[in-house]
Amino acid sequence: PGMPGPYRAYTECKNRGIFPMAKIAIMGFGTVGSGVLEVCRRNAASIARRAGEPVEVKYILDVRDFSGSPDAALFTKSIDTILNDPEIKVVVETIGGTKFAYPYVRQCLESGRSVCTSNKEMVATYGAELLALAKEHSAAFLFEASVGGGTPIITPMHQCLAANHISSIRGIVNGTTNFMLTKMKRENMGFDEALKIAQQLGYAETKDPGDDVDGRDACRKIAILASLACGHHVYPDNIPTRGIRDITVADIKAAEKLDSAIKLIAWYNEGGDGQMAAG
């Protein structure tokens, strides 16, 4: 049992196993990448116990200058450093986006290295292709953290619910907009003020919060879940998407009068004719 079609490869990746391992590389050293390094060090003993041997971060790929960092010796600006080292069997991708992450992940998988990522844009756009590539080269392409953050949903879908037919998915998958809508409702706050607070707290991007407030983040997440549910790649560009940018306090009050609340809901439905819809 497991996922049908190309997304069965995700189950095969999980079952193939990538442990035990000794040395890994991190691609990208922003908030997520630095967090991965911190967790690897802080939880080194428990990771070693579960993996069967110690896990060490040998390289960090980032084009910026970290010469003043205590970990300066780990940094490289070239993907070739990772690809030319036979000790590196697992790569953690935290670059984000697709411009650099996608070709780098392709090269890692083609070289037989397993990749773990939380990059929802890359998974939503190229997931089926990268899963097939991983299978071809006996590697694993794992993306549990791309939806739900620390809340497991992908593994339960393809393992715990392997005997079930998933015909519908519906839920709140973007925490930033949920935080903003809650603020707007409880504190009678306008959109701009709620967004400013979300940005100050680090929930929303300061320069361009569009991924959250315009619904693109939620769109990518439901594309991933829909793909796993139906076994075929669902492209985010084919999913009608609307965010919360136009929601006003008046809208929220009108919903309250109907004993309702405004939420950004991502959904997937399978029709009786075998067709599917998502939004």
Residue ranges with predicted function:
Residues M27, E93-I95, S118, T125, ...:
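Structural motif
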